[in-house]
Amino acid sequence: MADLTKLVDELSSLTVLEAAELAKLLEEKWGVSAAAAVAVAAAPAGAAAAAVEEQTEFTVVLAAAGEKKIEVIKEVRAITGLGLKEAKDLVEGAPKPVKEAVSKDEAEKLKAQLEKAGAKVELK
């Protein structure tokens, strides 16, 4: 049983690219296709798996600039490092992602910054 726990720990530490490579290697070794198995197995267990796994990467999406557009543009520039024109285009083109693949803590911090400036923000 300890070997299985160790294996689970090692598999959990794989990056997405490493997991994809592992899937390809197992498909070749066993002569199967993971796509068919996932489609059949994911239907009944999809909701349960989503409830168990907590999202680790978030995208901070600017839903609307609100009344204080200039303040929001300043915050977007500070967060992203974009130039004035690029930040203005992003704010005026809302809803748009401001920052992608960030941790939950960082996403919450960025959301608070943008909301303080007057923006409406979503985390996805």
Swiss-Prot record:
Keywords: Ribonucleoprotein, Ribosomal protein. GO terms for cellular component: cytosolic large ribosomal subunit. One of its GO terms (biological process) is translation. GO terms for molecular function: mRNA binding; structural constituent of ribosome. It comes from the Bacteria. Gene3D superfamilies: 3.30.1390.10, Single helix bin. PANTHER family: 39S RIBOSOMAL PROTEIN L12 (PTHR45987), LARGE RIBOSOMAL SUBUNIT PROTEIN BL12M (PTHR45987:SF4). HAMAP family: Ribosomal_bL12. Homodimer. Part of the ribosomal stalk of the 50S ribosomal subunit. Forms a multimeric L10(L12)X complex, where L10 forms an elongated spine to which 2 to 4 L12 dimers bind in a sequential fashion. Binds GTP-bound translation factors. Forms part of the ribosomal stalk which helps the ribosome interact with GTP-bound translation factors. Is thus essential for accurate translation. Belongs to the bacterial ribosomal protein bL12 family. This is Large ribosomal subunit protein bL12.
